[in-house]
């Protein structure tokens, strides 16, 4: 079966609402919120991971036990109460699960990891983790020691029931029979199945697979049936009890065999609506045969986001970026540099592990280990998508080989000899290379290049293509016709816990691309008034103010610190540069305290805000009405101006939303509370839940007249969406004038205003009150 159509009797939700479950918002809080979500029009509550995680974890992706619901998140009692409430209200539940890794920040909290460290390769949990014991001389390397650390900072604790090694607050187990009278901590450490090493040594010596480069998240081997069963028994118990109807798979690209994993999961949960957090590059499709409904929606986000940009503006935006910042590198240059940086540093251990596997498989290969490692690095750097799934994606490997050989002709021989090994599906070499390319792409591009190439940062979004620009309504329609045919049950989204910016920040950033000299002149003055050693980073900072507006200075300082360290040009996480960082923080302070800079920014923010509202409502309507299952990220039914995590995981004021929704007695005005966005969201979600038959097809509706390019309109089979795009250009050109569209046969009512329409509708009338219209057929 093609992905996108569930082969089972899965109950596909009409929409989902994502909640971040944690200590300060446990499952009981979700249960209390359920009636509001039901009133909003949602059909499924979509939960972040709820299995036991590292104590205090705000996100829950660092699972320490698969056996139970996290007590901090409300425990089994909280889960059952939420399940009962959801059932009572007719709501489904979707859970987020993490098959790729476990949290090992504190070994004492993770029984499987503790026993692995204590008993080594003979541990009953040795098959759980992906450890290269040979590379560590039979020991697992734990890069937890500080810069100046040595064995003499370790201490021996024999006060408990079993002896432990201590390094400050870190605790480690001791193998039986390895403590002799008079031993110091260093003597005991030398006899363990693990070796504590300085954190900087991880780049070369790390010998267990991690989630990306996060030492505290150890990869697990769900490809082993026993590990799959043990790590999924609890989740499948919820499914069997009828408490869970949907599953979201975190990071499938980390798995050794994603297709095999998904087959096993779909067989164990045949009635579940399954989506995968898979990021596809432009033009890339989900692998055929995956038994899933689709992705978690980053592909849809990109289709909607680019609609807010005018392809005709790209040349000017690029030219002015180069002039303002002095950065004349292309997006492709930034991708190459970002990927090479991480492949040579934080993910180099993965390259070395594949190199060892190559040497083991082909001892007589006529290339040095150094050449093999460099050839593997070049192939990974040149890989055009996150990963292949051999034999699917074989052409990606060939293309990467061509590119790699053209960049490093002296490695052509090694590259050519590696190709048969890398394309031999199911072998250790092939699998590890596929796992590595995804990590190198994520860290080198999303977490590095996205912070360096700052031409129009609203396009630097997960699933997006910062090197592309806008798209036309015709291109959008083509993508939706394909989506309706191939992925009608895939999730769609505009904001997640992983997006670089919330949808409403991006809506305002899109306005900057329309402003032309009004924006570039302001940016020039800001860059001059508060100098930062990197003008490209300064340009990112001032765009961030324009997009987020006057958020608290604490939030902006925290964002600036994360962004400049991710960019790793001038400062970084490992070796922060005090001078560079002080200059950036000074610029942030001056935005709030310096009268000239503050008023420059304030005038800009005030000017773009109404057009930002227009873009916010347009993209929301398009996302909620387009083919797929729309997700609403917690709180984003009102305007929410959030930056990258942890900023986008702040507590949500649900009481405000509840009161606004209950208090509606008609269409609210367009203003700063965002009530209009809540009104729009609730009208469309309720319609999708109550009249699914009106959302079964996709027909582009041609807009004609002088401002035709400023609208996008489509009919889903009885529900019609009409949205404004490029509002600045529309106003400058004199408004809608006699632009209009021919409604499909029948009589329609705009669910947002209550107005009746039929036949040819003039957009000046249709969009008089709001920049959007949502019409349903009444006859």
Question: Which positions does each model-derived feature cover?
Answer:
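An anion/pyrophosphate-binding glycine-rich loop and adjacent beta-alpha core
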Residues: 384
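Carbohydrate-interacting/catalytic domains
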Residues: 2-55, 67-72, 80-88, 118-120, ...
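Coupling/switch/interface segments within P-loop NTPase motor domains and analogous charged loops
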Residues: 152-186
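Hydrophobic or amphipathic alpha-helical targeting/insertion segments
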Residues: 82-129
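Active-site groove signature of glycoside hydrolases
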Residues: 243-252
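Catalytic P-loop NTPase motifs of RecA-like helicase/translocase cores
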Residues: 101, 255-256
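Surface-exposed, active-site-proximal loop segments in enzymatic domains
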Residues: 57-70, 108-110
């Amino acid at each position: 079966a093609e992905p996108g159509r569930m082969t089972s009797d899965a109950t596909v939700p009409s929409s989902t609402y994502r909640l971040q479950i944690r200590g300060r918002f446990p499952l009981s809080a979700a249960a209390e919120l359920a009636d509001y979500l039901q009133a909003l029009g949602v059909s499924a509550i979509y939960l972040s991971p709820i299995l036991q995680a590292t104590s205090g974890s705000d996100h829950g992706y660092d699972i320490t036990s698969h056996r139970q619901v996290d007590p901090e998140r409300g425990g089994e009692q909280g889960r059952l109460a939420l399940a009962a409430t959801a059932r009572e209200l007719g709501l489904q539940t979707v859970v987020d699960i993490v098959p790729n890794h476990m949290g090992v920040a504190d070994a004492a909290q993770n029984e499987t990891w503790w026993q692995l460290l204590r008993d080594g390769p003979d541990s009953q949990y040795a098959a759980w983790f992906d450890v290269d014991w040979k590379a560590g001389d039979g020991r697992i390397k734990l890069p937890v020691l500080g810069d100046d650390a040595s064995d003499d900072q370790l201490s021996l604790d024999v006060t408990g029931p079993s002896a432990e090694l201590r390094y400050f607050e870190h605790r480690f187990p001791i193998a039986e029979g390895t403590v002799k009278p008079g031993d110091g901590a260093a003597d005991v450490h030398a006899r363990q199945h693990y070796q504590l090493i300085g954190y900087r040594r991880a780049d070369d010596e790390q010998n267990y697979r991690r989630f990306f480069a996060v030492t505290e998240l150890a990869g697990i081997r769900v490809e082993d049936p026993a590990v799959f069963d043990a790590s999924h028994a609890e989740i499948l118990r919820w499914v069997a009890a009828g408490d869970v109807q949907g599953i979201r798979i975190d990071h499938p690209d980390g798995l050794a065999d994603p297709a095999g994993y998904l087959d096993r999961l779909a067989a164990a949960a045949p009635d579940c609506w399954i989506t995968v957090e898979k990021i596809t590059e432009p033009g890339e499709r989900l692998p055929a045969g995956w038994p899933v409904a689709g992705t978690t929606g980053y592909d849809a986000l990109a289709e909607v986001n680019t609609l807010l940009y005018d392809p005709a503006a790209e040349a000017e935006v690029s030219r002015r970026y180069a002039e303002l910042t002095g950065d004349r590198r292309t997006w492709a240059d930034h991708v190459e540099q970002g990927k090479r940086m991480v492949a040579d540093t934080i993910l180099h251990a993965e390259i070395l592990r594949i190199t060892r596997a190559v040497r083991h498989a082909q001892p007589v290969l006529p290339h040095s280990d150094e050449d093999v490692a460099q050839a593997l690095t070049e192939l990974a750097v040149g890989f055009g998508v996150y990963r292949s799934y051999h034999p699917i994606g074989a052409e990606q490997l060939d293309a990467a080989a061509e590119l790699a050989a053209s960049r490093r002709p002296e490695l052509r021989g090694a590259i050519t000899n590696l190709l048969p090994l890398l394309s031999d599906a199911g072998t250790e070499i092939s699998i590890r290379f596929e796992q590595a390319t995804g990590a190198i792409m994520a860290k080198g591009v999303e977490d590095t290049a996205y912070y360096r190439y700052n031409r129009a940062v609203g396009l630097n979004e997960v699933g997006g293509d910062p090197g592309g620009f806008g798209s036309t309504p015709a291109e959008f329609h083509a993508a939706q016709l394909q989506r309706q045919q191939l992925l009608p049950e895939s999730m769609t989204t505009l904001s997640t816990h992983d997006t670089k910016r919330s949808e409403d920040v991006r809506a305002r950033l899109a306005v900057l691309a329309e402003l032309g000299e009004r924006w570039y002149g302001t940016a020039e003055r800001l860059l001059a008034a508060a100098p930062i050693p990197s003008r490209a980073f300064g340009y990112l900072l001032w765009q961030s103010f324009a997009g987020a507006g006057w958020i608290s200075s604490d939030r902006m300082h925290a964002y600036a610190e994360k962004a400049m360290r991710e960019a790793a040009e001038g400062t970084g996480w490992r070796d922060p540069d005090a001078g560079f960082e002080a200059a950036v923080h000074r610029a942030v302070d001056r935005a709030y305290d310096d009268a000239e800079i503050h008023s420059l920014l304030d005038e800009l923010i005030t000017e773009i805000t109404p057009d930002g509202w227009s873009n916010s409502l347009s993209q929301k309507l398009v996302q909620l009405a387009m083919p797929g299952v729309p997700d609403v990220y917690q709180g984003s039914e009102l305007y929410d101006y959030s930056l990258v995590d942890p900023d986008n995981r702040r507590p949500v004021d649900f009481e405000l939303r509840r009161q606004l929704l209950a208090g509606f007695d008609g269409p609210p005005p367009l203003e700063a509370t965002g009530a209009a966005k809540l009104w729009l969201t609730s009208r469309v979600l309720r319609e999708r839940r109550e009249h699914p038959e009106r959302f079964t097809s996709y027909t582009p509706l041609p807009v004609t007249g002088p401002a035709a390019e400023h609208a996008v309109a489509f009919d889903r089979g009885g529900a019609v969406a009409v949205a404004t795009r490029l509002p600045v250009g529309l106003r400058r050109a004199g408004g809608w004038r006699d632009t209009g569209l021919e409604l499909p046969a029948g009589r329609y009512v705009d669910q947002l205003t209550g107005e009746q329409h039929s036949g040819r509708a003039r957009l000046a009338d249709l969009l008089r009150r709001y920049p959007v219209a949502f019409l349903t057929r009444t006859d």
